[in-house]
């Protein structure tokens, strides 16, 4: 979603404020983890460190964004605090899904080894 789609359903606050309120409410109710759009990772990690965060909407830099308006590439999502990234179409619709997955995996492993 983007700000316009949020406003269209009658919510007049910013996406950032809405996400912050939802995260705080979830944490107050002892959730196991959060499912967040990639662009919302910064909000969550400022509120609480070491929480499990599932992130769908991953799109590599050279792939189509499809309907995702607030996506990030896999490495950026990991760097911003994603615990689990959920990647569908960029892998399943690629010409070589196995190669695509291996490239993503290698990129993330290399980053994690250094950090």
Feature-to-residue mapping (PLM):
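Conserved anion-binding
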Residues: 1-42, 46-54, 59-65
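Conserved beta-strand positions in the central sheet of alpha/beta enzyme cores
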Residues: 35, 85-86
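Generic hydrophobic/aromatic pocket-lining and core-packing "Φ" positions
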Residues: 23, 41, 74-75, 101
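C-terminal helical cap(s) of enzyme catalytic domains, especially alpha/beta-barrels
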Residues: 78, 91-115
